[in-house]
Amino acid sequence: MSDRIDRDVINALIAGHFADPFSVLGMHKTTAGLEVRALLPDATDVWVIEPKTGRKLAKLECLDSRGFFSGVIPRRKNFFRYQLAVVWHGQQNLIDDPYRFGPLIQEMDAWLLSEGTHLRPYETLGAHADTMDGVTGTRFSVWAPNARRVSVVGQFNYWDGRRHPMRLRKESGIWELFIPGAHNGQLYKYEMIDANGNLRLKSDPYAFEAQMRPETASLICGLPEKVVQTEERKKANQFDAPISIYEVHLGSWRRHTDNNFWLSYRELADQLVPYAKWMGFTHLELLPINEHPFDGSWGYQPTGLYAPTRRFGTRDDFRYFIDAAHAAGLNVILDWVPGHFPTDDFALAEFDGTNLYEHSDPREGYHQDWNTLIYNYGRREVSNFLVGNALYWIERFGIDALRVDAVASMIYRDYSRKEGEWIPNEFGGRENLEAIEFLRNTNRILGEQVSGAVTMAEESTDFPGVSRPQDMGGLGFWYKWNLGWMHDTLDYMKLDPIYRQYHHDKLTFGMLYNYTENFVLPLSHDEVVHGKKSILDRMPGDAWQKFASLRAYYGWMWAFPGKKLLFMGNEFAQAREWNHDASLDWHLLEGGDNWHHGVQRLVRDLNLTYRHHKAMHELDFDPYGFEWLVVDDKERSVLIFVRRDKEGNEIIVASNFTPVPRHDYRFGINQPGKWREILNTDSIHYHGSNAGNGGTVHSDEIASHGRQHSLSLTLPPLATIWLVREAE
């Protein structure tokens, strides 16, 4: 028995309860020379090897049959590079000792990570292929400050937590280890003795790729190369740009007909991308593609925030999909979920045995609606983890925008909570000050680091300044979903036309607050689930009236100020609710031409016409870009307004939300002349009744609605028409 290492230390090391393996393992100076110690379970013989010559310098003595070896190299005083020749089951292997390498994380990185100001923590934490002292391998780093011991386990060490315990950097709470020979494509996890003495297996929070569910291991893979933002992609996100978003759940847009299995990222690149381009959309918005264990969460309960889900292929396959979208002229928006995470024990929940990422008090840290945990935004390392993730998707994948989910649940402490179920902030208020600061900081950093990328907030309350700059007291988002507009207009459209006259304000109210935010008008996935019916099925009347009302509504929506968002299936009037376990009802477009084809053609024409005419998008957020011409004709449910571009060019939009055609409907206009009908939702091309104005109509010098000149139009039943003034 050696007197150099205490038996209790050897026992603790072998049992996996020793927190400082580098103080024992590796090469150490002693009075007798350099001593090399190694923990190599199941080994029978171990030699220290001179790499250049292959000469055996010393044989290590087995001090414990469970695999602890030690030996002295006399007359050597200075550390040198060495290898170990290890005999396992009669076979000799030459390995590099992971415990001969010094600290991995640079002092500045460690300081920035501790301060929560490391803009790109994913470049340091996680698993990264590297070469150290001429040796190739992988460096692992994980933040677990309260764990008693952390080891890397994986395919490279038989998932044995004794073989690769990590070094704790006490100043930052980060554990680190370089493992020679570990390479891309291998599975790994972190095995730890947590703060309470329990053994845990955890996926890497910073894993760049993960196993296909239900398996939960992380994959070693390098950081993807940075994607350069082009000027075209930047311009497509600007406030004066036409933005028409096709919102997609990749797992149910279309499936293989023979087995109902998902399309891969590459198949989606070949099918979804050209379809969205043909339909005239400018942006694709993807429901969360971060790795998540439960299909039914639609991705909104992620466990691998840095890993694209393996359901549809590899990380590189996802990059291929995004590249294909960009090549087709489509910007890509990613739904991003920094508001909460699931309770699965392999992921972030009680990561090191403490409430590391979440609040400890369930009144702050538990979301009862979704059975999820809420991030502790006041903890610097947690907010850094999330801010870094936002940058990661934009810089490393070329994501053009992030749509932030459930912002209201983040910024209000009493969100969906009764009295006594929440804790006021330090001033006694209901606002979550830490979450507000986190959102402001995230938007500020994105604006500074990736100018041209934007964020969009799904925020369901009247919290002021969501899309206003931070220096004006806002949250700093570029856009906000207008959920109030969506609810009001859908409530109006589901009414029998007889009763719409009594709810006229539901269509006009939105203009009273339209310029308080930069709005996106969303008809999202949330509106076609949970018994709400499809958008088509909410329309009243028989089939003709349902389709006519839907077309009129789309014509109204595309003309109303604000960017557009339509969930998949709505573009061809899917009749049933969305089912995440099945394909869209593409069979509705099979066979002869029908009403569904008509709606699909209308949406395509709406997109193309909207994009072509600057008046329809250039001044969405400027009052000069909109003016009511007829706002008070509630008895006939008629509304008429103009959209205007910076040069003063106007487009007239007229909607009739009753099934009664309105002939010789006169209203005052600003610009006399000849007006051409450029879109009519009642056109026979869309399977309407084909009522209209024969292409063009001339104004009259007849005063109406306080204006000197006027138009007399036929307003088709349940329809919206757009007219543009012809040049003289």
Swiss-Prot record:
One of its GO terms (cellular component) is cytosol. Keywords: Carbohydrate metabolism, Glycogen biosynthesis, Glycogen metabolism, Glycosyltransferase, Transferase. CDD domains: AmyAc_Glg_BE (cd11322), E_set_GBE_prok_N (cd02855). Its EC number is 2.4.1.18. The keyword Acetylation does not apply. GO terms for molecular function: 1,4-alpha-glucan branching enzyme activity; cation binding; hydrolase activity, hydrolyzing O-glycosyl compounds. GO terms for biological process: glycogen biosynthetic process. It comes from the Bacteria. Pathway: Glycan biosynthesis; glycogen biosynthesis. It is an enzyme of class 2 (transferase). The keyword Hydrolase does not apply. SUPFAM superfamilies: (Trans)glycosidases, E set domains, Glycosyl hydrolase domain. The active site is at 405 (nucleophile), 458 (proton donor). It holds the Pfam family CBM_48. It catalyses: Transfers a segment of a (1->4)-alpha-D-glucan chain to a primary hydroxy group in a similar glucan chain. Monomer. Belongs to the glycosyl hydrolase 13 family. GlgB subfamily. Catalyzes the formation of the alpha-1,6-glucosidic linkages in glycogen by scission of a 1,4-alpha-linked oligosaccharide from growing alpha-1,4-glucan chains and the subsequent attachment of the oligosaccharide to the alpha-1,6 position. This is 1,4-alpha-glucan branching enzyme GlgB. It comes from Shigella flexneri serotype 5b (strain 8401).
